[in-house]
Amino acid sequence: MDFDDHDDGDEEMPPMPVSSSYETPPQHGLAGGGMAPKPPGEIGSRVKGPSCGGGRYRECLKNHAVGIGGHAVDGCGEFMAAGEEGTIDALRCAACNCHRNFHRKESESLAGEGSPFSPAAVVPYGATPHHQFSPYYRTPAGYLHHHQHHMAAAAAAAAAAAGGYPQRPLALPSTSHSGRDDGDDLSGMVGPMSAVGPLSGMSLGAGPSGSGSGKKRFRTKFTQEQKDKMLAFAERVGWRIQKHDEAAVQQFCDEVGVKRHVLKVWMHNNKHTLGKKLP
């Protein structure tokens, strides 16, 4: 009957599967018109999530030298999915084997026109700029060998940037006082930014311009009568203040109107000038 032939034709037509946008399209063309059997490992490899739409993923920004404090990229220029959409391999790049999140995402609005500002083009201050894309073909096992000199240059540039502006050492006063006490009125006040060291003691008696700073140091003024009395007292004690002369020194300072350390510094400064003139 014609009806039997019509029924046989309906039974031979394979059912058309309905696939969503998250699943791979069915494969046809096999014997019998059915779909290809799925391998056991593919059943659990599908993920539920949005597709790669909404923008393109450009160059890989993963730093492969972060462990040694450097910066080295693999040179991958654009993300290329390693598997079909909807699988776990779709999130892995077939070129650099990195996750899709390491690639710079370019939105659809900027896909037609180049982005005016790219985070990958930012070079740290003091670092040596390096080529973003490798001129050589990258092999899966040796892509880091070409960037070793970039890693060394980046590490050297980072060290130079950190130590390129060395801080000036703190100025410390000289430890050799040469007989001068602390708080000397004649020693002068030296600014914190001036070079203070073993030569700071040579500024005594050198005049107002002897100090390394621009500030004029304080100098005690003596009258001629005070100079004559201090000269006579210095000759009497031998140009040195000893312990058994403390009472006489204190009495002399009260009479003349000078401090003890001022008298001591004056004797030290004039011992080699006024003392040598004596017969």
From Swiss-Prot:
Main location: nucleus
Keywords linked to the UniProt accession: DNA-binding, Homeobox, Metal-binding, Nucleus, Transcription, Transcription regulation, Zinc, Zinc-finger
InterPro entries named among the record's database cross-references: Homeodomain-like_sf, Homeodomain_ZF_HD, ZF_HD_homeobox_Cys/His_dimer
Classification via PROSITE patterns: ZF_HD_DIMER
DNA-binding interval(s): 215-278
Bias type Acidic residues, positions: 1-13
UniProt zinc finger (ZF-HD dimerization-type) residues: 57-106
Site feature location: Required for DNA-binding: 267
Pfam families reported in the protein's UniProt record: ZF-HD_dimer
Subcellular location as annotated: Nucleus
Molecular function terms, GO-annotated: DNA-binding transcription factor activity; transcription cis-regulatory region binding; zinc ion binding
Region (Disordered): 1-47, 168-190
GO cellular component terms given for this protein: nucleus
Gene Ontology annotations of biological process type: regulation of DNA-templated transcription
Superkingdom classification of source: Eukaryota
Subunit structure: Homo- and heterodimer with other ZFHD proteins.
Stated role: Putative transcription factor.
UniProt remark on domains: The homeodomain differs form the typical one by having namely 4 instead of 3 extra amino acids inserted in the loop between helix 1 and helix 2.
Protein name, UniProt field: Zinc-finger homeodomain protein 1
Organism of this sequence: Oryza sativa subsp. japonica
Phylogenetic classification of the source organism: Eukaryota, Viridiplantae, Streptophyta, Embryophyta, Tracheophyta
